[in-house]
Amino acid sequence: MKRETVTSARNPLLVHLKKLLAARSYREACGEFAADGTKLLEEAAKWYPGLETVVVQTGVELCPLPEHVRVVEIPESLMRSVSQMEAPQGAIFICRLPEARPAALRPGTLLLDGIQDPGNLGTILRTADALEVPVVLLDGCADAYNPKTVRATMGAVFRTQPVRMTRAEAVQSCRAAGISLLATAMSADAVDLRKKNLSGCAVVIGSEGRGVSAELFAAADGKIIIPMNPRCESLNAAAAATIVLWQMKC
């Protein structure tokens, strides 16, 4: 595959790439996102039809790429200036953002309410992909296409597309489909999740600091709790989601 060569940090492609890595608003305005790393590139080349451009460091071997993909070679010094990684792997790439899908829920869906940490969000998406559970991102969630989120998914974001909804849309969709909405909670009236059949429900995981929003608590058909040692105050959002996801598959 023929490679173009760029040697200037002022090149429009590199300026564009740095903006994609830095700002959600720019990603959404352009309809593109960028990711960093050779392993992620392998996953994108294998699973994601929206792969558009690869920027590769001189001397770095690339995985097989689709014929339509543009390949641009840059020196190591430029790769270090563009990459957000402390030890760049030598490949950064640009993809189209996926087209928005119709907002509709089905039984056995995990709803994420205000998960703001990109690492936690990426870990949850990775686990959900492994267990084949659909995920909906509600108000206040981190960007699924933030570079940190994408890295934490380990490529899962290229295989499954999380849907975005407002809280009101999620509640309305549950009601329309006859799906029970359950909220995770640290409260005395919450039911041990092992006593519930979660496969036919939509389950809400709340933010790391505030938990499930008051709006969704008020709309929920019930509350569930992960039983744990009373000395422990709470679980990390990604850890809690992993337990809920496993229970949804049982």
Model-based region annotation:
Residues K46, P98-S187:
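RNA substrate-binding interface of SAM-dependent RNA methyltransferases
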Residues F93, D129-A130, C141-A144, K148-V157, ...:
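Structured adenosyl-cofactor binding patch, chiefly the S-adenosyl-L-methionine
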Residues P64-L65, S81-S83, K148, Q172-S173, ...:
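Short, charged, surface-exposed secondary-structure boundary motifs
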